[in-house]
Regions:
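N-terminal signal peptide c-region/cleavage motif recognized by signal peptidases
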Residues: 6-12
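A structured, mid-to-C-terminal "fold-capping" secondary-structure block
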Residues: 13-14, 122-226
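Short N-terminal segments immediately surrounding and downstream of signal-peptide cleavage
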Residues: 14-28
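Amphipathic, well-ordered alpha-helical segments in soluble domains
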Residues: 32, 36-40, 62-66
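Membrane interface segments of multi-pass transport proteins and intramembrane proteases
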Residues: 36-54
């Protein structure tokens, strides 16, 4: 869902949508779930004190550092991987389990990488666009990369399935809450907006924001990382 935030001004690789009819049906199903469950719950969570929400965001961002670091290595960026693993160690200890983002205060910038992006840097084409029930928009490439990224997630290796499920639900709730204030950006055909924004954001992430000049995108990237 966070991918809906990015403007349609970015250039991105060509991704076909041969399953549009099926994708639209799935999109309507997801919209129904969001309207009846996710959005009302996120609206309730929005009333929580900002420091609590900030701590939750930081903690879940911290859990993704291992996945990001591993993929940085696979993409041939060892120094960036060192930066990210350093963030994880510092924030997990001094930052009390990642609640406080000490790493950023020390000048260690946060990055986001997954195995789908790694496949892209290896030259694997995006493949067709697909909309999945509950999970939302994907390309075929990112769909194949998802199991590896899930395996590299810290929560995947938690032995208590109830705790694992609970953390994933809180993560989804936290992400949905951050979207409430930017829903006004949605315009025109919502399906096309979501699809195009998703593809453009993937391109932005794969290129690490290089050679892309878009102040709106920079602002939104800061919003997501904060």
């Amino acid at each position: 869902m966070t991918l809906l935030l990015f403007s349609s001004l970015l250039s991105s690789e060509d991704v076909s949508d041969p399953f549009e009819d099926i994708n639209r049906l799935t999109f309507k199903f997801n919209e129904s779930l969001d309207r009846n469950i996710a959005k009302p719950t996120a609206s309730f969570y929005q009333k929580f004190p900002t420091p609590i929400k900030k701590g939750v965001t930081n903690a879940f961002d911290n859990l993704e550092e291992i996945n990001t670091s591993f993929n940085q290595v696979l993409q041939g960026k060892p120094l960036t991987a060192l930066n990210d693993i350093s963030r994880f160690v510092i924030n997990s200890t001094i930052g009390i389990g990642g609640i406080f983002d000490v790493g950023t205060a020390l000048g260690l910038k946060r990055h986001e990488e997954d195995f789908g992006q790694t496949l892209a840097t290896w030259g694997v084409p995006a493949g067709p666009y697909v909309m999945l029930p509950v999970l939302g928009p994907h390309t075929l490439r990112d769909l194949f990369g998802r199991p590896v990224s899930s395996f590299l997630s810290v929560t995947f290796h938690m032995t208590d399935s109830d705790v694992n499920f609970g953390l994933n639900m809180i993560d989804a709730l936290e992400t949905r809450e951050r979207l409430l204030e930017v829903e006004s950006l949605l315009s025109g055909d919502k399906y096309y907006f979501v699809r195009d924004s998703y593809i453009q954001y993937l391109d932005y992430e794969i290129k690490d924001g290089l050679n892309i000049e878009d102040n709106f995108t920079d602002d939104m990237d800061d919003f997501l990382i904060d």
